[in-house]
């Protein structure tokens, strides 16, 4: 069983071939191919965390779709002054499928 821990959108994700990961928006758009930086590689009993060895490892993923996350609401309120502020935000996300760990 081969799996890797990759840096995806500012976070670390444990992935195997065939895993679908949702991460922050990637510029390549839909149906593009991207490479993710490996932080750790596990191949059976062999664990690789050395940066020199990991520079040779490539984790390839294909972009499935671009989507937006759930809406969150930010509110500010100051007592006795009538000050109210309301703002919403939806994070832009990309869903990718891991197609290879080499």
From Swiss-Prot:
Reported function: This protein binds to 23S rRNA in the presence of protein L20.
Pfam families for this protein: Ribosomal_L21p
Name the record gives this protein: Large ribosomal subunit protein bL21
Single biological process term from Gene Ontology: translation
Cellular component annotations (GO), alphabetically ordered: cytoplasm; ribonucleoprotein complex; ribosome
Oligomer and partners: Part of the 50S ribosomal subunit. Contacts protein L20.
Domain of life: Bacteria
